[in-house]
Design a protein with these regions (language model features):
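Non-catalytic alpha-helical scaffold/packing segments enriched in small hydrophobic residues
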Residues: 69, 73, 93-96, 147, ...
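Intrinsic structural disorder
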Residues: 2, 202-205
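Short, flexible loop/turn segments with low-complexity composition
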Residues: 210-212
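GST-like fold's C-terminal all-alpha helical module
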Residues: 101-203
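GST-like domain detector, emphasizing the conserved glutathione-binding G-site
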Residues: 1-132
């Protein structure tokens, strides 16, 4: 059986668990204890070269260790409801926004968090190699995340959802990054009218609201 190695509440795993909830897919799950460093073990690195969660283990032992890749694989098995787009252009637009969120939202919030959190000393980047924290990068991450919110608010001035007129994984990723990034950087969502309206609408979707 397929199983998902995850850590409840962490941003990247949440991108997959909310996707599963929206699709109505149930998988066996295994909790990985990040605080104890379980993800840095030889055994886990054999499954995930970057020592990151989530990881989807397939029936034959193959591992997928990237949130985007995991969702693409599951979408091929469970095409409805379509969350990665239907037609070629729609799929391309969803991918475009998912990558934009990854580069501008996830990376900026991670930059702010990993370079400032005490528990991340010598782990400013994923993986087992020691990487020192840099205060200036934490400060830059805070600024970059603010720019991310401004730009996303602008996108939502023209369309109902992040990638267009339909709810997709781009909305899931934006929600996850906002929850994580606003907590890390102390940014205030209320300063962005379009974003605030979109957030309330998405946050109140039944599958997402059920998360608790």
């Amino acid at each position: 059986r397929m199983r998902l190695l995850t850590c409840t509440g962490a941003p990247s795993p949440r991108r997959v668990t909310l996707y599963l909830a929206e699709k109505g897919i149930e998988l066996d799950t295994v909790e990985i204890d990040l605080k104890s460093g379980e993800h840095l073990s030889d055994e886990f690195q054999a499954k995930s070269p970057e020592c990151t969660v989530p990881v989807l283990e397939l029936d034959d032992g193959t591992s997928l260790w990237n949130s985007i890749a995991i969702r693409q694989y599951l979408e091929s098995l469970h095409p409805e409801p379509a969350l990665l787009g239907r037609e070629a252009l729609e799929r391309a637009r969803v991918t475009q926004y998912v990558l934009w969120i990854e580069h501008n939202g996830m990376m900026s919030a991670a930059e702010a968090f990993r370079n400032a959190a005490k528990g991340m000393a010598d782990h400013a980047l994923p993986g087992r190699r020691p990487v020192p924290q840099i205060d200036a990068l934490a400060e830059r991450g805070v600024r970059r995340f603010g720019h991310f919110l401004e730009d996303l608010d602008g996108f939502l001035d023209e369309q109902g959802y992040v990638a267009g007129d339909a709810f997709t994984v781009a909305d899931i990723d934006a929600l996850v990054m906002i929850d994580f990034g606003c907590r890390v950087t102390k940014a205030e969502l209320e300063a962005h009218a379009n974003l605030s309206k979109w957030y309330e609408r998405v946050r109140n979707r039944p599958a997402i609201r059920a998360e608790g």
